[in-house]
């Protein structure tokens, strides 16, 4: 007789925790696989589809139980975890738990402007995505000082008739409620149905401890992939943003202030500055490819010189790249040849057989006009 596994609303992600992609979403299950591979993943708690659905109607999980694994005064990120990554989800909310006390503490570590900019970005994100206020009212100035923070707090209070919440439990509860309701909205439902999701598709959420750049050693954030997204050829691609720049923007290949990953004549690289951590990244990437049976994009941080893996997601790729990646995985005995064939979408063959213009190339406009 097969034993039924029961799933609670909150699950601390450990190697032996009861987690399923159909209950907690693909991101939560992938994080568990990374933990099982002994990769250095920050403390993470997964909320089940049922827990998120309940949050949408106001039945929130126990906030004290949710926060307990993270210790005192944590800063957290909350990210969506749908069953299929292609179905999307609400925007991630970072630095949940930021308040006046943490702001004062961070000033002593990183200086007033850097700490204030992090606080401003959290207030902006909370106001727009959680309180659903007008984005035009929450512009972050070029120079982040105490005056701009006071002004933004005053704007929030004027728009909501209440002060910006200082309790991490209140902040986290409202973030969970907002993300759950966004998933249940009509627009979000229609968009994911257009991608093949069932109308009642569930959403999980993952709450993860943030690694902040407050140590004496090197701190920063980056993203790395090990094949070219356009061609599928082996190639390390990505960027690394050092120190507090990593907490101030989403990392992407053209991020301002980023340094290269591999040695490059155009500037500094992670491989030159921190060869040991770079070698670890390459090792982790190879392990992900073998164990997850896929080419992945890996998000990582350095915290006081120590490498941490935040997430790994299936690499977005062109049709041409998908063919080459599937062939390479089969040739390396990572997946069977039959599975490699089934992974290739029919449309990819048409793209492969016809000449293509590199979508990342710059185009020079020769003529412009209009017709009727």
Question: What is each PLM-predicted segment?
Answer:
Residues 1-370:
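Nucleotide/phosphate-binding sheet-loop regions of phosphoryl- and nucleotidyl-transfer enzymes
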């Amino acid at each position: 007789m097969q034993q039924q596994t029961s799933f609670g609303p909150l699950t601390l992600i450990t190697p032996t925790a009861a987690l399923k992609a159909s209950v907690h979403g693909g991101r939560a299950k992938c994080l568990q696989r990374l933990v099982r591979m002994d990769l250095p993943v920050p403390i993470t708690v997964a909320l089940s589809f049922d827990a998120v659905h309940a949050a949408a109607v106001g039945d929130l999980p126990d906030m004290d139980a949710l926060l307990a694994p993270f210790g005192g005064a944590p800063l957290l990120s909350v990210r969506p975890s749908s069953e299929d990554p292609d179905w999307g989800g609400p925007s991630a909310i970072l630095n949940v738990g930021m308040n006046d006390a943490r702001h004062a503490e961070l000033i002593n570590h990183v200086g007033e402007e850097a700490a204030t900019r992090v606080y401003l970005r959290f207030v902006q994100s909370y106001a727009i995505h959680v309180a659903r206020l007008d984005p035009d009212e929450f512009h972050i100035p070029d120079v982040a000082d105490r005056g701009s923070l006071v002004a933004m707090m005053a704007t929030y209070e004027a728009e909501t008739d209440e002060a910006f919440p200082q309790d991490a439990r209140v902040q986290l509860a409202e973030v969970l409620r907002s993300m759950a309701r966004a998933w249940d909205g009509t627009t979000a439902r229609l968009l994911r149905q257009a991608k093949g999701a069932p109308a009642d598709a569930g959403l999980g959420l993952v709450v993860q401890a943030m690694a902040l750049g407050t140590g004496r050693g090197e701190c920063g954030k980056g993203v790395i992939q090990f094949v070219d997204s356009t061609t599928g050829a082996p190639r390390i691609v990505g960027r690394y943003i050092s120190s507090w720049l990593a907490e101030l923007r989403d990392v992407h290949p053209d991020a301002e202030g980023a340094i290269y990953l591999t040695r490059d004549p155009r500037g500094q690289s992670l491989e030159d500055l921190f060869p040991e951590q770079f070698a670890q990244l390459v090792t982790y990437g190879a392990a992900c490819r073998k164990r997850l049976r896929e080419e992945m994009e890996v998000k990582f941080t350095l915290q006081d010189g120590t490498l941490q893996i935040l997430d790994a997601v299936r690499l977005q790729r062109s049709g041409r790249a998908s063919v080459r990646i599937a062939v390479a995985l089969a040739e390396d005995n990572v997946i069977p040849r039959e599975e490699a064939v089934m992974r290739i979408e029919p449309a990819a063959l048409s793209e492969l057989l016809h000449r293509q213009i590199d979508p990342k190339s710059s185009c020079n406009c020769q003529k412009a006009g209009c017709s009727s």
